[in-house]
């Protein structure tokens, strides 16, 4: 079968990725020497994995068999995919749920015929995961995201924004547990090189987490102007989401301005429930940051009326508001399957607020100091459990714990 030089280079790089992933699982048969034994020389394998070309396609065929993959290129399918990808990105840009769903189904109907072939197997997986993300709100595992990162540089440009969206869907949730890893991974996917405007939301998030507020403000203005000019009200709501977060840090007077913008937008236009839920959640966060806990609790609750997403994180924030208002802790129940998708630190925080009322204060203190403290790096989470600990030591008189808590936090955040 004839395969273009460009695709051969990509296939070779994929072979390198797959071999390294297998070798990382301590499978000795995937070392350079063992892997190519009887097929080609070590130098030839190194050349192939770096994107160089072999003189014989048979080498690729035999190497791919080790991963149960076939060798080939189908230009007719590629051309059809490029057309459908354009439609998919347009649907994502306006968050047209039904068109996203229908387009991915069409794409995978094409790909299912060739999903046993190298490159197409990756596309089939990417599209399947994209479907799960947009249609079923899937949370991805670290292993899945790491694989997407491993193949990112080797994918054709037209598919990179799809990968960026998948990778960012995980990073926006997991950043609180490892900010350094978040920054490294965000820099890896080069959001500034994205071809589609909606991917810039990842850049807004990056500016927020790295506290580059001036850059974030400039990008916000640019995106608000663009989406107003294109009458894309769903994405305009997304811009407002980030505006609430930004201005809660730098200029709280602007928050009320954006609340009025949201009210006007949601009154005039029919918008997806998930987007209204997100905007209410971020209004709640802006009030939370200003210690206006009653308003925050109101909007967190309103958010869940429209869409029950990210229940674990939302539950922690709701519990904090209830705690500070002197209310009984009453947070959303999370199914086990969904719960297991979250990082350990977030699960431990949620479990804390699920402790029975009868659990003694000294047991709660120990839980915070032993189980939670090693994972606390995010300012919001630190503040939540610093407050909780201060309440507990009033009962136990163990004020030394507050000093130890502050000392350990400084170690984590210095």
Task: Name what the model sees in each region.
Residues 19, 48-49, 59, 67:
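DNA major-groove recognition helix of helix-turn-helix
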Residues 1-26:
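A short, Lys/Arg-rich alpha-helix, primarily the initiator
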Residues 125-411:
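Extended amphipathic alpha-helical coiled-coil/heptad-repeat regions
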Residues 2-6, 71-83, 376:
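TPR-adjacent "capping" and linker segments in tetratricopeptide-repeat scaffold/adaptor proteins
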Residues 56-74:
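DNA major-groove recognition helix of helix-turn-helix/homeodomain DNA-binding modules
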Residues 17, 31-34, 58, 62:
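Alpha-helical residues within helix-turn-helix
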Residues 23-47:
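Short alpha-helical DNA-recognition segment
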Residues 81-135:
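Helix-turn-helix/homeodomain-like alpha-helical modules used for DNA recognition
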């Amino acid at each position: 079968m004839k395969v273009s030089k460009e695709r051969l280079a990509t296939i070779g790089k994929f072979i390198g990725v797959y071999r390294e992933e297998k070798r990382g699982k301590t499978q000795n048969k995937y070392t350079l020497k063992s892997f190519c034994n009887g097929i080609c020389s070590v130098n030839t394998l190194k050349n192939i994995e770096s994107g160089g070309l072999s003189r014989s396609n048979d080498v690729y065929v035999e190497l791919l068999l080790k991963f149960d993959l076939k060798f080939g290129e189908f230009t007719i399918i590629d051309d059809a995919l490029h057309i459908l990808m354009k439609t998919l990105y347009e649907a994502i840009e306006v968050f047209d749920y039904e068109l996203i769903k229908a387009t991915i189904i069409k794409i995978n109907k094409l790909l299912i015929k060739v999903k046993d072939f190298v490159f197409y197997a990756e596309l089939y997986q990417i599209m399947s995961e994209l479907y799960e993300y947009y249609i079923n709100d899937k949370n991805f595992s670290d292993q899945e995201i790491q694989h997407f990162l491993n193949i990112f540089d080797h994918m054709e440009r037209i598919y990179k924004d799809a990968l960026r969206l998948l990778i960012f869907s995980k990073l926006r949730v997991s950043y609180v547990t490892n900010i350094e890893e978040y920054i490294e991974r965000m820099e890896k996917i080069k959001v500034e090189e994205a071809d589609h405007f909606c991917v810039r939301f990842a850049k807004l998030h990056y500016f927020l987490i790295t506290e580059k507020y001036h850059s974030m403000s400039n990008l916000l203005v640019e995106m608000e102007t663009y989406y107003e000019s294109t009458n894309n009200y769903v994405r305009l709501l997304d811009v407002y989401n980030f505006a609430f977060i930004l201005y809660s840090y730098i200029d709280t007077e602007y928050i009320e301005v954006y609340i009025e913008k949201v009210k006007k937008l949601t009154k005039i236009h029919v918008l997806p429930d998930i987007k209204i839920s997100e905007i209410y959640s971020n209004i709640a966060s802006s009030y939370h940051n200003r210690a206006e806990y009653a308003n925050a609790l109101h909007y967190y609750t309103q958010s869940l009326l429209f869409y029950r997403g990210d229940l674990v994180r939302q539950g922690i924030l709701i519990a904090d508001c209830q705690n500070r208002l002197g209310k009984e802790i009453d947070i959303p129940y999370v199914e086990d399957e969904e719960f297991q998708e979250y990082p350990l630190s977030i699960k431990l925080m949620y479990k804390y607020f699920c402790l029975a009322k009868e659990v003694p204060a000294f047991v709660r203190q120990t839980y915070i100091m032993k189980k939670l403290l090693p994972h606390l790096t995010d300012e919001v989470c630190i503040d939540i459990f610093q407050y909780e600990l201060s309440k507990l030591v009033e009962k136990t008189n163990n004020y030394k714990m507050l000093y130890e808590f502050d000392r350990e936090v400084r170690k984590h955040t210095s």
